[in-house]
């Protein structure tokens, strides 16, 4: 099997959609020899910030000299970036080789009466198999959707569970209240385990604490009160903070927005907890500093161009939109802002627009390359409630070119 054939096989599993449950992934992994059982996993769930926290944790551990797997989704540029070891994407040849093996196992499953695995189940199985082959020391594992019945939650043990910011998203699948969504996220907490928790609403905290009580797990709420931000602009942020009674001065991150400072502190808390577990022999402050500053997470308030400044961000729910709006307000207040936007129909479009659009003078709508995308003309009609200067361009390339052609060097896109 060639790499292109492997991708085609994976894409065919798309037709099985999203199916939450652990029976299928469990059988597939059993046929692969249960590779996940060999791994030391930091398991991260939540609505916003999962990938950033996983990336911070992964980079700090690498700076400590460990071999670290990083599993995230979706991908931004190339499929192989979903499965990384020490910053390197899984090689295409390994994708082809492992998918060929997985295909054989799936045929056995189906003959035994099991359903075809979904795309996410197939890719998750491949990740576990690859990390086990690579004999990684740790895996920073990002939940795909929810937690309780997510394919990543087939693991029976983790070093620590982490729950980042929780807000309303995927309400059709996870539930339409913070309490219901928090319950799904808290599903990653293990019996007698430990969970590190981002600052949450009281409703979310109560649910997570209740799950911890039921599972005899330890609940640790990360404190974000003692933070002194010394510098914050579109290029980097410098801050002092105290994490688990240890003070750090002049930490620097390249990720933008106050929420990313909180995400970095959550990552430091994970590292310090692992040290307390005697899982880290060679952790030091310099490793933490280097890991933080070397963390890049594309598509999160990321500046990709100057003159005009061009920023890309993946905000697609209310909390994500608030974080983006806050960062724009802080860095570009009073400047002329242009928004190029495309969204999926199943997102909370109205809430996102209501939060973001007061910051923009001009808007270009486009249609993402996704079967769930909202048509750019329909999106334009929604935007017109807030902004007068709105243009619809169906093709993304046309939309980008039009945006650049109609902007001056002083504009912010």
Residue positions per predicted region:
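Short functional linear segments
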Residues: 1-46, 53-66, 71, 107-114
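C-terminal helical cap/extension that packs against the catalytic core
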Residues: 201-210, 216, 220, 235, ...
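Hydrophobic alpha-helical packing residues
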Residues: 57-62, 131, 356, 383
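ATP-dependent carboxylate-amine ligase catalytic core
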Residues: 29-30, 34-37, 63-156, 172-174
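Glycine-rich phosphate-binding loop signature in dinucleotide/nucleotide-binding domains
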Residues: 131-137, 330-335, 403-412
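Acidic, Mg2+-coordinating active-site environments of NTP-dependent enzymes
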Residues: 110-112, 134-142, 158-250, 264, ...
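Beta-strand->loop->alpha-helix junctions that form or flank phosphate-binding loops
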Residues: 74, 198-199, 213-233, 252-258, ...
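Nucleotide phosphate-binding/pyrophosphate-handling subdomain across enzymes
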Residues: 38, 138-141, 149-162, 166-170, ...
